[in-house]
Amino acid sequence: ANNPGARKAIRKIEARTEVN
């Protein structure tokens, strides 16, 4: 998904995984 919104969501999920 090259959509900016989807990328933002993926980045947010990645950040959450990093905190995990």
Swiss-Prot record:
Record field: compositional bias (Basic and acidic residues): 11-20
Q: Does the keyword rRNA-binding apply?
A: yes
Chain intervals for the UniProt region annotation (Disordered): 1-20
GO CC terms: ribonucleoprotein complex; ribosome
**Which GO molecular function, any one, fits this protein according to its record?**
rRNA binding
Q: Which UniProt keywords apply?
A: Ribonucleoprotein, Ribosomal protein, RNA-binding, rRNA-binding
As for what it does, the entry says: Binds directly to 16S ribosomal RNA.
Family under the similarity heading: Belongs to the bacterial ribosomal protein bS20 family.
Recorded protein name is Small ribosomal subunit protein bS20
According to its UniProt entry, this protein's organism is: Brevundimonas vesicularis
Q: Coding gene? A: rpsT
